[in-house]
Regions:
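C-terminal beta-strand-loop-alpha-helix "lid" module of Rossmann-like NAD(P)-dependent dehydrogenases
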Residues: 1-198
Length: 198
């Protein structure tokens, strides 16, 4: 699942995600892709099973959840990866290629459960539901974190652009002041020369 951006100034973020997409293509194998983000679209790619814009994803991404649920119940996927840009803090955004299936080692930890419980019915169904819930959770978190990364990038680029505009404006004013001073000095020098000649 590739989570890219749609808004302005996200080309660098999308290029990292797109680069990883191309790496997986080179390695071959049977891959199904879900692409979120207009700028990541890959036309006429048979491995893409679903494409949607970032806006469509934020409004309703049930189609992705349905594909994941169907893949789990039919045991179609040996691996599911989320590829996105991860917002860490106000100054740090990392490229993330996260395997969410099979479950990461150490997810449960070394805890020993001493409580027992009774389950009536098919435990396979319960485990599938838990796995689908986990995948949904990971997708939700990645979606919001990557949106935050995109917003931070846009904010940083906008701030930098405004700073450069201010620097150019200050440079223009400095040049105007310098020209005005040179003109005033020239007038003073002309007046002094005229007074001296009288």
């Amino acid at each position: 699942i590739y989570l890219g951006g749609d808004m302005g100034f996200c080309g660098n973020l999308n290029s990292l995600v797109k680069g990883r997409c191309q790496e997986y293509e080179k390695n071959g194998g049977s891959v199904e892709r879900i692409i979120v983000g207009k700028k990541l679209k890959r036309y006429e790619d048979p491995s893409v099973i679903l494409e949607m814009s970032r806006e469509e994803y934020m409004e309703d991404h049930q189609a992705i959840l349905d594909i994941l649920a169907q893949g789990i119940t039919q045991k179609r996927y040996s691996e599911i990866r989320l590829i996105y840009n991860h917002y860490r803090n106000a100054s740090e955004i990392d490229f993330e290629d996260k395997a969410i299936l099979p479950l990461p080692k150490g997810l449960i930890g070394d805890q020993a459960y001493l409580d027992d419980f009774v389950w009536e019915g098919d435990p396979q169904e319960m485990l599938q539901d838990l796995l689908i819930l986990y995948l949904t959770y990971e997708l939700e978190i990645a979606g919001h974190v990557s949106a935050a990364a995109e917003n931070l990038t846009r904010q940083n680029v906008t701030t930098e652009s405004l700073k450069r505009i201010d620097e150019r404006e200050e440079e223009r004013r400095r040049i105007e002041r310098k020209e005005r001073k040179a003109e005033e000095f020239s007038k003073v020098l002309d007046n002094f020369t005229r007074l001296r000649n009288y």
